[in-house]
């Protein structure tokens, strides 16, 4: 927990069967945490350890679950919200790559993130369906990982876990267009287009070193994409 600023986080999701009663766990660096369900206060949590607050026997209702953190004087310092996510509506594909581009050096890699989302673009936290990928253009499939036979190594059919997974592709030595398509049962296909950047080569050698283009990060917080 970053103690340089006030933060609050509800562990888990808020999509459960009707009549579910369960504990809710909140991580916060405030002095007290209050839980609200659809605007109604459920009281203050029990402090189990320095950062962990527990709310026992919370009756599930679809909607909005909020944790509000207070300092020692009762002033609000941070809050976090979970909402019930709707039915799966589509796949969302995102490329994560070097800020200076995806280089055609035969070694550069790009991450493909696939998410199952509802109509509002919120990730479906209980979805574990299999996504089928196709790849065309100047890249090679290096795959991802998932629970199952051989952990789906290099498999182009990859299950999501809690609505998300990632796979790697590697550039070829020729710059060009790359098209990735993702399909899953019951959902429309998603398509993503990437373009690799040419790399200067002299006598079979290149002076492009991707590690030199990435800036160091010393700040605290979530890992940046």
Language model segments and positions:
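Short beta-strand elements
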Residues: 78-87, 188-210
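Substrate-binding clefts and catalytic carboxylate motifs of secreted carbohydrate-active enzymes
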Residues: 1-106, 119-124
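Exposed beta-strand face motif in extracellular beta-rich ectodomains
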Residues: 61-65, 110, 174-178
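Short, well-ordered beta-strand segments
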Residues: 75, 126-147, 155-158, 192-193
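Short, hydrophobic beta-strand segments
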Residues: 55-60, 154-173
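Short aromatic-acidic-glycine turn motif
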Residues: 90-93, 133-149, 200-205
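Compositionally biased low-complexity segments at domain edges in trafficked proteins
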Residues: 95-120, 208-225
């Amino acid at each position: 927990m970053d103690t340089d600023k006030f933060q609050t986080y509800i562990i888990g999701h808020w999509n459960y069967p009707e009549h579910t009663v369960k504990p809710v766990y909140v991580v916060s660096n405030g002095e007290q945490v209050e839980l609200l369900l659809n605007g109604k206060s459920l009281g203050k949590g029990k402090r189990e350890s320095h950062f962990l607050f527990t709310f026992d026997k919370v009756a599930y209702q679809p909607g909005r679950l909020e944790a509000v953190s207070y300092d020692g004087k009762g002033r609000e310092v941070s809050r976090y919200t979970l909402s019930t996510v709707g039915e799966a509506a589509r796949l969302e594909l995102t490329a994560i790559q070097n800020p200076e581009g995806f280089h055609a050096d035969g070694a550069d890699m790009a991450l493909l993130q696939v998410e199952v989302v509802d109509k509002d673009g919120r990730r479906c936290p209980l979805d574990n369906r299999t996504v089928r990928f196709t790849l065309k253009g100047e890249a090679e499939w290096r795959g991802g990982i998932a629970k199952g036979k051989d952990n789906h190594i290099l498999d182009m059919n990859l299950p999501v876990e809690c609505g998300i997974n990632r796979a790697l592709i590697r550039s070829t030595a020729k710059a060009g267009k790359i098209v990735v398509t993702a399909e899953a049962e019951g959902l429309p296909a998603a398509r993503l287009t990437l373009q690799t950047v040419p790399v200067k080569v002299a006598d079979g050698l290149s002076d492009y070193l991707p590690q030199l283009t990435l800036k160091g990060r010393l700040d605290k917080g979530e890992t940046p994409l």
